Amino acid sequence: MNDAALAPDVSAALERGLQAQSLDTAFAAPLLRYLALLVRWNKTYNLTAVRDPRAMVTRHLLDSLAMQPYIASGMLADLGTGPGLPGIPLAITRPQLQVTLVESNGKKVRFMREALRHLELRNARVAESRAEALDEPTAYDHLTARALDKLAGIIAVGGHLLRPGGSLLAMKGIYPHEEIAALPEGWTMSEVHQLQVPGLDGERHLVVVRKA
């Protein structure tokens, strides 16, 4: 399947969503190529429980891109990225960002490598590893985690990757009061942004945590 095989309403929904997020609709073309590849591989390899391409636009692409106003450049490690979410959409829309996609599942790693080749995406690479085993201490300005763990758990497995003063950007549903209260020593909550994801009901928050 190529992007042309996706139904017209999928492309239209993505373009509307990009406009709502103040992003250039020129990004629709590479995002649709990524989506088409994900749909094709998902039929065989079960990379995501979301099957419908229109739902993928909202729940994967636009949800991932909701954090892009808060991260523009630097070195980013996306922990437990699965098939490349949010890392690949962020790499597409933020060319100044250098993204490392951290994932230990072999089939998801193979998919991401094919996606990067297919998209000719030069500002992203795949690290086939569990986050805690990645031997790149203090190499990153930012960490992201979309559905990995509670804040303390993310820090436990990936905190060593972040430079002092760097930021963890964690996607959450409802405001995570208890998780923020349980942050380990040396980590402080910097900002919490309530996110608006076009077409997605329910609360979404981006929690920004700083490393001392």
UniProtKB/Swiss-Prot annotation:
It catalyses: guanosine(527) in 16S rRNA + S-adenosyl-L-methionine = N(7)-methylguanosine(527) in 16S rRNA + S-adenosyl-L-homocysteine. Pfam families: GidB. This is Ribosomal RNA small subunit methyltransferase G. The lineage of its organism: Bacteria, Pseudomonadati, Pseudomonadota, Gammaproteobacteria, Lysobacterales. Signal peptide: none annotated. Belongs to the methyltransferase superfamily. RNA methyltransferase RsmG family. S-adenosyl-L-methionine binds at G80, L85, A131, E132, R146. Its EC number is 2.1.1.170. Specifically methylates the N7 position of guanine in position 527 of 16S rRNA. HAMAP family: 16SrRNA_methyltr_G. GO terms for molecular function: rRNA (guanine-N7-)-methyltransferase activity. It is found in: Cytoplasm. InterPro entries: rRNA_ssu_MeTfrase_G, SAM-dependent_MTases_sf. Its main location: cytoplasm. GO terms for cellular component: cytosol. Keywords: Cytoplasm, Methyltransferase, rRNA processing, S-adenosyl-L-methionine, Transferase. It comes from the Bacteria.
